Amino acid sequence: MPELPEVETTRAGLSPRLQGRVLTRVIVREPRLRWPIPPDLDTQLRGLTLHGLARRGKYLLFDFGAVTQLVHLGMSGSLRLTEPAEPAARHDHVDWRFDDGTILRLRDPRRFGAVLLTENAPGHPLLAGLGPEPLSTAFDAAYLHTQCQRRKTAIKPLIMDAHVVVGVGNIYASESLFHAGIRPGVAAHRLSRAACARLADAIKQVLTAAIAAGGSSLRDYVQSSGELGYFQLQTRVYDREDAPCRRCATPIRRIVQAQRASFYCPTCQR
């Protein structure tokens, strides 16, 4: 699933090409995504100028003035800039055509993504209850420690909860816990303030490094240019079961938490 670094990389790649452009047409080939694409998407957006492109958690927010388009990439989605001569492939479900000839194309093989419209983005049900951005000053040791003290759940599911902090998916949760020296199964309420400080810093550092690497391309994700992300080449524990730890050579272990695979080093993480 595209996580915060992949979505932020997509936003950064699209924004300079699309901001200020006028949308001339929307072509919907397959409206049946996680939620049905609004049937009047083309009617509502045609002729509008894209004023800006922002991100909230794993959602992209296309600001068309009176209306905002929300896009979620789901499990397998990607947004790419294409030329008019490039034919649509099987899983290319939506095209947004702009006045300079640029086409923004949504590819989503598993169709778990979403394209929605709203006149009140901050108050939209999908956004209103989200936690702070992990790279913001609102997410720090004090905040994380307070959240941990309220819950007896394991720490990895907690930092993957978008109501606690947005955008920390499975890959980056495992990597952040490794850098903080914390096992994924440790009860959140048992973490000290110092441990929460290490973890908050690790989350920021891992996400920043992943954005710089263009995200992780494990299955379907590509950047808006069509290039792959490369963070998966530098992971310390994720998807490395039985491989030697890059720090101490202990075999990496894999466990399942909330139906998700977690990876950790039993020596480096306590």
UniProtKB/Swiss-Prot annotation:
It comes from Thiobacillus denitrificans (strain ATCC 25259 / T1). Transmembrane segments: none annotated. NCBIfam families: fpg, PRK01103.1. GO terms for molecular function: 8-oxo-7,8-dihydroguanine DNA N-glycosylase activity; class I DNA-(apurinic or apyrimidinic site) endonuclease activity; damaged DNA binding; zinc ion binding. Binds 1 zinc ion per subunit. Pfam families: Fapy_DNA_glyco, H2TH, zf-FPG_IleRS. SMART domains: Fapy_DNA_glyco, H2TH. GO terms for biological process: base-excision repair. The active site is at P2 (schiff-base intermediate with dna), E3 (proton donor), K58 (proton donor), R260 (proton donor). This is Formamidopyrimidine-DNA glycosylase. CDD domains: EcFpg-like_N. Involved in base excision repair of DNA damaged by oxidation or by mutagenic agents. Acts as a DNA glycosylase that recognizes and removes damaged bases. Has a preference for oxidized purines, such as 7,8-dihydro-8-oxoguanine (8-oxoG). Has AP (apurinic/apyrimidinic) lyase activity and introduces nicks in the DNA strand. Cleaves the DNA backbone by beta-delta elimination to generate a single-strand break at the site of the removed base with both 3'- and 5'-phosphates. Its EC number is 3.2.2.23, 4.2.99.18. Monomer. SUPFAM superfamilies: Glucocorticoid receptor-like (DNA-binding domain), N-terminal domain of MutM-like DNA repair proteins, S13-like H2TH domain.
